[in-house]
Each structure stands twice: as C-alpha cells, then as structure tokens.
UniProtKB/Swiss-Prot annotation:
Name of encoding gene: rplO
Family annotation (Gene3D superfamilies): 3.100.10.10
Biological processes, Gene Ontology terms: translation
Name this protein carries in UniProt: Large ribosomal subunit protein uL15
Region feature (Disordered): 1-48
Length: 144
C-alpha cells in the first residue's frame, strides 16, 4: 500500500546552480567563470556548434569521401488499380501529367508503377512510357 510519507520525488536531484560574481572566495567571482577577454567573455555570446576557436574545424579537416546519388535519383511512385478506378473515368487517358494535375503523384515524380490491388473496371488509355505496369495489371487489362 502506498503511504503519503513514502512518496519520493520521481525526478533526479538537481545540482545546485553556481552563484556567479559573488566574491573571490566563491570560486566564481569577478569574471564569473568566463575568463579574461575574448568572445566568450562578452555578453550575448553563443558559440556555434562545431566552432573551435577560429582554428580549422573538424568537419573541414576530415576529407570528403564517396559520392551521393540522391540529387540524381529518379523519383518513382506506386499507384494501385483501385486508386486509378476512383480517379479516372471510363476511356480516360492515363499519363504523368494527368496524374500530377489530379495531385495523385508528386510533381517531381518521373516514373509511376501501377500495382494490382482491387479491380480495374474501367477501360483506360495508357499514354505515357513512364508508367510501368506490373505483370498482374497487364493480365487484368488484357482480360478487360
């Protein structure tokens, strides 16, 4: 059973904050732990992350290695047959522009893959070579 007198503070004890500028015997008097002169002694100074006192910082001393392909990667999105059923009418042309106009795909997208999920009841005209159909979708289109 929990008793009122047995309750403990859940947070860990906090270290006492240093009293600054309260005489030489406190250990943090006069310059208040800031040292003499320089940027750090001035009010309002905040050292930026990675700053090493004016020397060449570590991130510039370490050589760059490798290559990142993310800038050049083609953006490919997937779309289901169920979603195409909702968006397009019977006999509509399916192209990247049509999908972008309807805000189904992102404007940066350069390729779309159509995946079989649900039925595709409508006869659609595939206009774009950038739209790739999965094997299941191809067989479904032939059946329709």
């Amino acid at each position: 059973m929990i008793k009122l007198e047995c309750l403990q503070d859940p947070s860990p004890r906090k270290r006492r904050t240093k009293l600054l500028g309260r005489g030489p015997s406190s250990g943090h008097g006069k310059t208040s732990g800031r040292g003499h002169k320089g940027d750090g002694s001035r009010s309002g100074y905040k050292r930026r992350f990675g700053y090493e006192g004016g020397g060449v910082p570590l991130y510039r001393r370490v050589p760059t290695r490798g290559f990142s392909h993310t800038r050049f990667d083609k953006c490919v999105e997937e779309i289901t047959t169920q979603r195409l059923n909702e968006i397009f009418d019977n006999g509509a042309e399916v192209s990247l522009e049509a999908l972008k106009e309807r805000k189904v795909i992102h404007r940066e997208t350069s390729r779309v893959k159509v995946i079989l999920k649900g039925a595709l009841d409508k006869k659609l005209v595939w206009k774009d070579a950038a739209i790739v159909l999965s094997e299941g979708v191809k067989s479904l289109i032939e059946a329709v």
